[in-house]
């Protein structure tokens, strides 16, 4: 039986503040896996790194496809290559090999354009460095052939991605649990 508690539930807050030992060990492993890919980034590049990860986590593959670590690496690499090429004065859009990676790359490019449209100044070089770090992290996670979504799971845990129902899905009613 599952109880649907709101985010403000005091019991959930206590569980987040004092996680179980297994959860704490997993968090330590996750941070240890991510640090090598971001240790060379500046603060601004780290912000872009996590911004692109939020785009990756929000991305919904179409139809029967699913997003894999390889797709994340291809998409990040292609967008980074496009930005690096533009920095040299050549307009050429690099394209990832897989269709899910192409769609993710399109979403990443759209997010970058949207942020720039709001007036935020983002240099192509900074964004490319952050994307190359994502590509390296996804490539490193692919070394474990048993799990082809290890990097996505890692990022989801670190960003505390909570599954939100889609707009067309039915929302379950809240729990009838009464707290004093």
Task: Outline where the language-model segments fall.
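Charged, low-complexity interaction segments
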Residues: 21-111
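C-terminal, charged low-complexity interaction regions
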Residues: 83-180
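Generic preference for hydrophobic/aromatic residues in regular secondary structure cores
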Residues: 9, 51-53, 80, 134, ...
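Generic structural motif recognizing short loop/turn segments at the entrances and edges of beta-strands
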Residues: 3, 45-46, 173
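N-terminal cysteine/histidine-rich coordination modules
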Residues: 1-25
């Amino acid at each position: 039986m599952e109880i649907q508690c709101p985010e403000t539930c005091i019991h959930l807050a206590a569980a987040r503040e004092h996680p179980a030992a297994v959860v704490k060990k997993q968090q330590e492993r996750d941070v240890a896996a991510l640090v090598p890919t971001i240790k060379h980034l500046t603060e601004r590049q780290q912000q872009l790194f996590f911004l692109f990860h939020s785009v990756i986590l929000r991305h919904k593959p179409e139809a029967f496809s699913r997003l894999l670590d390889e797709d994340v690496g291809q998409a990040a690499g292609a967008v980074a290559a496009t930005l690096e090429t533009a920095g040299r004065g050549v307009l050429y859009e690099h394209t990832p090999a897989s269709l899910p990676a192409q769609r993710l790359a399109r979403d990443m490019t759209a997010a970058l354009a949207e942020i720039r449209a709001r007036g935020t100044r983002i240099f192509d070089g900074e964004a490319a460095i952050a994307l190359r770090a994502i590509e390296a992290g996804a490539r490193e996670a692919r070394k474990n052939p048993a799990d082809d979504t290890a990097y996505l799971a890692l990022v989801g845990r670190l960003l505390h991605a909570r599954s939100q129902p889609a707009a067309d899905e039915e929302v379950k009613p809240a729990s009838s649990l009464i707290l004093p």
